[in-house]
């Protein structure tokens, strides 16, 4: 049994806290910390105040160090903002504690995310005898594990992957994002990159559109190609992959609003002066959009996130589709959050279980696909995210 410190009390933090509390056999003590302690206290109240709460500025290494020394966890689960990954990693190094996150580092002033900043910590974590597990959400995270499963069990050589993320839910709002609006809009407006024949190919944001027929009654939906961080680590650690693409569904309504917001400058991340004050338009937009946490009781429908992997098996072309279906209303009933937060938070807890039980262990900085996928998936299903495998069959080449 081990103590865990969770940093971040948004929608994902709420899920992580609830799911850790369901596994007291692993997480004997839980502390939830955020810049706004009232958010932590509200989540604690949902759990009959059976957890500790604390205030911390995750941009401030000395504050983080003081909190970690006080709470003495064996693991820090970082579900704060991607801008804060490095300060939390620094604090873990200073205090000798293992680290886990769900999204890679991104500088505040540049809409660019990549693993180079965090991979640079490899020698420091290894030298300290510590483990850092990066991207233990769903995508990245479970999608990496699905790719590793395809390589281990279904294909002798994985040559192509399509990671496909569908939110077939509806919240009834004119325009809202299902997670932090600032992070979401920065992500979807960034130039698209995909991996092909040993190099990154850049195209316009959401410029490539296809249709995909999703299972479990969801049916055909439009999907758009975009860049997503797990491709960077997957093609590094599974070098047989010649082509890797990431696709996501967006409604026409979402795209229409996004285009207008871009055209009028509201997605800018640089400062502008207004009434003698400097503001960042995208941060102002975040303040006026619905809080993603408020969408839980409004959201109905399902998500479907998975990987279509193609390659060779016994010298013949073969493909496998590995995916999960998650229901928004069922998630809200269980933990008070919609499926977007649930599908990120549950894998973070499972990653923590892998680390604390020694099923996944190493010294240094690791991505999910570097470990055996099966122990992770054996825990993920009972924790609420079962895996479906369709081995063979016809799936369109995207």
Predicted regions: what they are:
Residues 12:
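Hydrophobic/small residue at the entry helix of a nucleotide-binding pocket
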Residues 29-31:
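Short beta-strand element of Class I
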Residues 36-38:
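Helix N-cap at the beta1-alpha1 junction of Rossmann-like dinucleotide-binding domains, i.e.
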Residues 47-60:
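Rossmann-fold cofactor-recognition segment
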Residues 58-71, 80, 84:
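Conserved Rossmann-fold cofactor-binding substructure of NAD(P)-dependent oxidoreductases
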Residues 103-130:
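Rossmann-fold NAD(P)-binding glycine/threonine-rich loop
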Residues 152-398:
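C-terminal catalytic/substrate-binding lobe primarily of soluble NAD(P)-dependent oxidoreductases
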């Amino acid at each position: 049994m081990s103590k865990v410190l969770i940093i971040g009390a948004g929608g994902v933090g709420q899920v992580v806290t609830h799911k850790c509390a369901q596994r007291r056999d692993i997480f004997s003590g839980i502390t939830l910390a955020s810049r706004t302690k009232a958010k932590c206290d509200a989540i604690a109240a949902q759990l009959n105040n059976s957890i500790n709460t604390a205030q911390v500025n995750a941009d401030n290494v000395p504050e983080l160090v003081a909190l970690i020394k006080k709470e003495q966890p064996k693991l820090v689960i970082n579900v704060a903002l991607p801008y804060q990954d490095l300060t939390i990693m620094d604090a873990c190094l200073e205090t000798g504690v293992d680290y886990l996150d769900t999204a890679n580092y991104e500088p505040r002033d540049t809409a660019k995310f990549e693993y180079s900043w965090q991979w640079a910590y490899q020698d420091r974590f290894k030298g300290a005898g510590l483990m850092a597990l990066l991207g233990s959400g769903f995508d990245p995270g479970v999608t990496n594990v699905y790719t590793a499963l395809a390589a281990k069990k279904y294909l002798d050589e994985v040559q192509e992957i399509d990671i496909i993320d569908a939110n077939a839910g509806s919240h009834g709002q004119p325009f809202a994002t299902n997670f932090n609006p600032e992070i979401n809009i920065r992500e979807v407006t960034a130039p698209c990159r995909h991996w092909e024949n040993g190099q990154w190919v850049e195209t316009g944001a959401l410029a490539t559109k296809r249709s995909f027929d999703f299972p479990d009654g969801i049916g055909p939906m439009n999907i758009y190609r975009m860049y997503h961080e797990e491709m960077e680590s997957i093609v590094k650690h599974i070098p047989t992959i010649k082509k890797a693409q990431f696709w996501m569904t967006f409604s026409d309504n979402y795209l229409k609003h996004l285009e207008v917001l871009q055209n009028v400058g509201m997605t800018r991340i640089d400062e502008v002066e207004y009434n003698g004050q400097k503001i960042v338009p995208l941060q102002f937009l975040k303040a006026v959009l619905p809080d993603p946490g408020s969408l839980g009781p409004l959201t109905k429908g399902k998500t479907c996130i998975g990987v279509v992997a193609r390659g060779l098996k016994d010298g013949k072309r073969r493909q496998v589709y590995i995916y999960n279906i998650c229901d928004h209303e069922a998630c809200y009933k269980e933990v008070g959050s919609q499926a977007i937060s649930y599908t990120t938070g549950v894998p973070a807890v499972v990653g923590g279980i892998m680390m604390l039980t020694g099923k996944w262990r190493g010294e240094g900085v690791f991505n999910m696909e570097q470990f055996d996928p099966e122990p992770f998936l054996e825990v993920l299903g009972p924790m609420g995210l079962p895996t479906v495998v369709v081995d063979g069959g016809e799936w369109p080449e995207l």
